[in-house]
Amino acid sequence: PENIRQVVGLNPDLVILSFGTNEAHGRRYSPAEHLAQMDNLLGELKKGCPKAVYLFTTPPGAYVRNGRRGARVINPRTKLAVKTELDYAASRKLAIWDMYHVVGGERYACLNWSNGNYFQRDKIHFTQEGYILQGLLLHEAIIKSYNNYVETQLDGTWN
């Protein structure tokens, strides 16, 4: 509630909501619970920021431990969290940036991020460079989307 009041107090034009990494980290990940959490938060924010535009982002991929002391393996629940978010956004006509597939999807997202040294040691959180890259990728996607809008909407043509 306090975080929502803080967001509302900013009177934002755009609210970016990133879900999935924490939700998919638990072994008992539930798509239904994930949907309910997104719906609840979005509903609360829309009450206080009815004119804001909302942009969801999918998780980029992360690792989990394989057993108590096991090696880290790619989190198998991330792809389910991504699908849940993509379906949620599509069913509600919400904007969503699919970082998971932008950075390589099921086969390569984690490998690309690891090879670039963008994960911290826990293989969940990013390094400073990783967060900078995430921001740059999102910025690029927003600019491309805006340019596409300008080309197709403002002149009255549809490409």
Q: What kind of region is each of these model predictions?
A:
Residues 13-18, 53-58, 95-99, 125:
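Structural recognition of the beta-strand scaffold that forms the well-ordered cores
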